[in-house]
Each structure stands twice: as structure tokens, then as C-alpha cells.
């Protein structure tokens, strides 16, 4: 059995040849390659988002499209034939226009870009392979995983599932600053490999909210129901703004110090489904290109922390990624034989938004101050369900996406098809994806 484990946004402290790799990739990867990857990542993000929302329409949603894409792209290094085609096309790549090697070089470029030092935003991202100690992994796969995806390799004794589980979870916890503590559970003795991709993000608002201004206020779940939340407030803020009359929503961008920003999309009352149905890469480009600096007299945003847990092996087949979960899976580029298939893809994410900024992690297994004229008076209150997209402004990649339907919600749902468990956390954003591989 082989497994791919959840990815957490974060970067290993040691990566061989990183500076050399950055120079080589910058020389060999064109801007077209990276733009293609960014567009495909956005397309995949919105497609997955619609599936998650369809299964749980009234729940909070938070996930890292980049983490999930990276885990699956890394897995595709070991895939052949139709299994390979399904994975890459499921990630929204046009294989006629973008050859497979260009896709992997694009990920290499973005991962190197995200891990460059000196940024005021803390972004850590990386991958790890946990391999059954008796399993022979092809040297070519291991080297490509290291060179293209910065993947570290470790041996594990899956004949002792509890010990192997602790090894993997400790690794993820350490690389997500303790935000993702239990990425995987229930490993079986038949597990042969677990692939983990992680990402960790921590950013400070360029214009932080004053905690002394935070107050209790109503958040309207719908036209009839509301809850009391901690509402942050700021005033006389000059920030990118766009009013989309066509989709009946307001778009505001709040910047972090460094190369990151958060885009907030606030649909008019009753217009959330209309906005969700229109989510396409072209829509995001339109919003970004239409944002203009605007003085906002008062902006209110709830302080919140949400956590989700998804079993993606039930959702990815709906996006065309099917064969890798079946006995027809061809992952022979990993071991040289067709003896592996993916049994589980778990994605865990934690998102916290507070006065000073945002902290996030994920794992996949598999204010300008000024004066405002009376006629320019503008108030924006995020006191009803809204969307949030966190992006790296240098790589132009969407790192996290969230839908906040209830900032105060704390629920547990049974793990199942499309199920998620949500709990309140504080000051963090983490993502993790594990892919579990088993023998056939």
C-alpha cells in the first residue's frame, strides 16, 4: 500500500542546491510557463471549491489549492499512461499546450521563488516521502522528487502503524509551527509509502487593526439569522477596491508586509451563489486588474479562526482523477512495478485572521491615513458570508482560499464523503495533504 499524506504550507530548513536551483530555473523557465501554472492552479482551486461547497453549502471552507496541486503533481512523477494523464488534466493542465516536463519545471520555479529568504512574510513549503523500509524506490523518481519538488525522503516501519503515524505527524507539526498536529491517523500495515506536502504562512497586515477598536457585533448568517462575533475595525484606510456591479459584490485587497495580500470578496445579500457560480480564472484576473486605491472611511472585518479536514479521495474523482485510486493505477515510475495505488488523500487546513495579521498552515497527503470628502464616503462591513483568497504577489499564486459563513462556528462532522470537521483556532493558517499508497 502506498500513501500520500496531506500537505502543509511550509519549507524545510535544508534543501540541497537551492541557490543554484533558483538561478538555473530562472534561466530555463519562461514567464509563460509560470503563468500557465498559475492559471491552472486558479482553475483547479475554483473547481475544487465548488465541489466542497456543493457537499457542505452552509459550512466554512478553507483549503490550500497550491498545497493540493503540489502533492498531486509530485505524485504524477511516479505515474504513467492514463493515470498520469488523468492527474495532470485533473489539475487543469492542457497537455497539448503544456508538456509534462514544463509543468514540473513550473512547480520547481514557484517553490524556489516562495522559499527565497528576505521576505517579510513567512512562507514555508515542502514535501516529504515516508517509505516502507523494505520498499525499493527507483533512484530516478527519488532524484526528480528532490530536484523538482524539494522532497525529502525518510524510511518508516509501517508494520508498526502507531510508530509510523507519530513519525509523520511529528514531521508535519514541526514544519507547520505546531498548527497541524495530527495530519494522518489509522495507517494500516499494508501502507508502503506516504507522501506529505505542507505549507505554512504567517503574515502581518501592512496596516494592522487596533485591538482596542475590536468590538462585539452581529454577523448575519442569512436574512433571518445572526450571531455575535468579535468585529475588527479600522478607518480612513486607502486600499485597493473594486465594486463589481455585474456580479453584485465588493472586492477589497488588504496587503501584508512583504510579498503577500488577501483579497476579500463580499457578495451582496443573497448573491453568494451567483458569485460562486462565476468563479473562473478570468473572474479573478478581472478583479485584480480592476482594483484601484480608494479611501474607505470605515472597514469592519470579523476576527475568526476556522479549521477544516477533507477526505479528497471522494472528491478528486469528480474532477477526473479516478484511476490512481483503482487497481488499474499505474504508478510504476515509483517502484518499477504496478503494485501501488492511492488509498487516501487527506487535506487539513487552519486559518486565523486577527488584528495583527494572518497565520495559516496546511498539509496534503497526498492604511494610508487621510481625509475623505463627504461625497466619497465609503463603508464596507464584512458582516455577512464572504470569500478570502491569500496570494503571493511575487509568484502570483493563490496559496489559500476560504469561505467564511459563520466566524463563530465550532462543529464536528463525521469523516466521510466530502465531510469536514471544523473548530475554532487562533492566529494561524496551516494546510496539509497526505497521500497514502497501498499495494494492489
Curated annotation (Swiss-Prot):
Function: Serine and cysteine protease inhibitor. Can inhibit lysosomal papain-like proteases including the cathepsins B, G, H, K, L and V. Ineffective against elastase, granzyme A, granzyme B, or caspases 3, 8 or 9. Inhibition of cytoplasmic cathepsin B following release from the lysosome may protect cells from apoptosis. This may facilitate the survival of progenitor T-cells and the subsequent development of long term memory CD8 T-cells.
More details: The single human alpha1-antichymotrypsin gene (SERPINA3) is represented by a cluster of 14 individual murine paralogs.
Induction profile: Induction during apoptosis requires NF-kappa-B, a heterodimer of RELA- and NFKB1.
Pfam families recorded: Serpin (PF00079)
Entry remark concerning the domains of this protein: The reactive center loop (RCL) extends out from the body of the protein and directs binding to the target protease. The protease cleaves the serpin at the reactive site within the RCL, establishing a covalent linkage between the serpin reactive site and the protease. The resulting inactive serpin-protease complex is highly stable. Variability within the reactive center loop (RCL) sequences of Serpina3 paralogs may determine target protease specificity.
Tissue/organ expression: Expressed in bone marrow (particularly hematopoietic stem cells), heart, kidney, liver, lung, skeletal muscle, spleen, testis, thymus and T-cells.
Protein localization: Cytoplasm; Nucleus
Species in which this protein is naturally found: Mus musculus
SUPFAM superfamilies found in the cross-reference section: Serpins (SSF56574)
Stored CDD domains: serpinA3_A1AC
GO function term, MF aspect, one: cysteine-type endopeptidase inhibitor activity
GO cellular component entries: cytoplasm; extracellular space; nucleus
Region described as RCL: spans on this chain: 357-382
Similarity-based family: Belongs to the serpin family.
Keywords: Adaptive immunity, Apoptosis, Cytoplasm, Immunity, Nucleus, Protease inhibitor, Serine protease inhibitor, Thiol protease inhibitor
Gene that this polypeptide is encoded by: Serpina3g
Designated name of the protein: Serine protease inhibitor A3G
Coiled-coil intervals: none
GO biological process: adaptive immune response; apoptotic process; response to cytokine; response to peptide hormone
Annotated site (Reactive bond): 371-372
Amino acid at each position: 500500500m502506498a500513501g500520500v499524506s496531506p500537505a502543509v504550507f511550509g519549507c524545510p530548513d535544508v534543501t540541497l542546491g537551492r541557490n543554484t536551483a533558483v538561478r538555473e530555473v530562472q534561466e530555463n523557465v519562461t514567464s509563460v510557463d509560470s503563468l500557465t501554472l498559475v492559471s491552472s492552479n486558479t482553475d483547479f482551486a475554483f473547481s475544487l471549491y465548488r465541489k466542497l461547497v456543493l457537499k457542505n453549502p452552509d459550512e466554512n471552507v478553507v483549503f490550500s489549492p497550491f498545497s493540493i496541486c503540489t502533492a498531486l503533481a509530485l505524485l504524477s512523477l511516479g505515474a504513467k499512461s492514463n493515470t498520469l494523464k488523468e492527474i495532470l488534466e485533473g489539475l487543469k493542465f492542457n497537455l497539448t499546450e503544456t508538456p509534462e516536463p514544463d509543468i514540473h519545471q513550473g512547480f520547481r520555479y514557484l517553490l524556489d521563488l516562495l522559499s527565497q529568504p528576505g521576505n517579510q512574510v513567512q512562507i514555508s513549503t515542502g514535501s516529504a516521502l515516508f517509505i516502507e523500509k523494505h520498499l525499493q524506490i527507483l533512484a530516478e523518481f527519488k532524484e526528480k522528487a528532490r530536484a523538482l519538488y524539494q522532497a525529502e525522503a525518510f524510511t518508516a516501519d509501517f508494520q508498526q502503524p502507531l510508530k509510523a503515524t507519530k513519525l509523520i505527524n511529528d514531521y508535519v507539526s514541526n514544519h507547520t509551527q505546531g498548527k497541524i498536529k495530527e495530519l494522518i491517523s489509522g495507517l494500516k500495515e499494508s501502507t508502503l509509502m506516504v507522501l506529505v506536502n505542507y505549507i505554512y504562512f504567517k503574515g502581518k497586515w501592512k496596516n494592522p487593526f487596533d485591538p482596542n477598536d475590536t468590538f462585539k457585533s452581529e454577523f448575519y448568517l442569512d436574512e433571518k439569522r445572526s450571531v455575535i462575533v468579535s468585529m475588527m475595525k479600522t478607518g480612513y484606510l486607502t486600499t485597493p477596491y473594486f465594486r463589481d456591479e455585474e456580479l453584485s459584490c465588493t472586492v477589497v485587497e488588504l496587503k501584508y508586509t512583504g510579498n503577500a495580500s488577501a483579497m476579500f470578496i463580499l457578495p451582496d445579500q443573497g448573491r453568494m451563489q451567483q458569485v460562486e457560480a462565476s468563479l473562473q480564472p478570468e473572474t479573478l484576473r478581472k478583479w485584480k486588474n480592476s482594483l484601484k486605491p480608494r479611501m474607505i472611511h470605515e472597514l469592519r472585518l470579523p476576527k475568526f479562526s476556522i479549521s477544516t479536514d477533507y477526505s479528497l479521495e471522494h472528491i478528486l474523482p469528480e474532477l477526473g482523477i479516478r484511476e490512481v485510486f483503482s487497481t488499474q493505477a499505474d504508478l510504476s515510475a515509483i517502484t518499477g512495478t504496478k503494485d501501488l495505488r492511492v488509498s487516501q488523500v487527506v487535506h487539513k487546513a487552519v486559518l486565523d485572521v486577527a488584528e495583527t495579521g494572518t497565520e495559516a498552515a496546511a498539509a496534503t497527503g497526498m492604511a494610508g491615513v487621510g481625509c475623505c470628502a463627504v461625497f466619497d464616503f465609503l463603508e464596507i462591513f464584512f458582516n455577512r458570508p464572504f470569500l478570502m483568497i491569500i496570494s503571493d504577489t511575487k509568484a502570483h499564486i493563490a496559496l489559500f482560499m476560504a469561505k467564511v459563513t459563520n466566524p463563530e462556528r465550532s462543529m464536528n462532522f463525521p469523516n466521510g464523503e466530502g465531510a469536514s470537521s471544523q473548530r475554532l483556532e487562533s492566529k494561524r493558517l496551516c494546510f496539509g495533504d497526505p497521500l497514502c499508497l497501498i499495494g494492489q
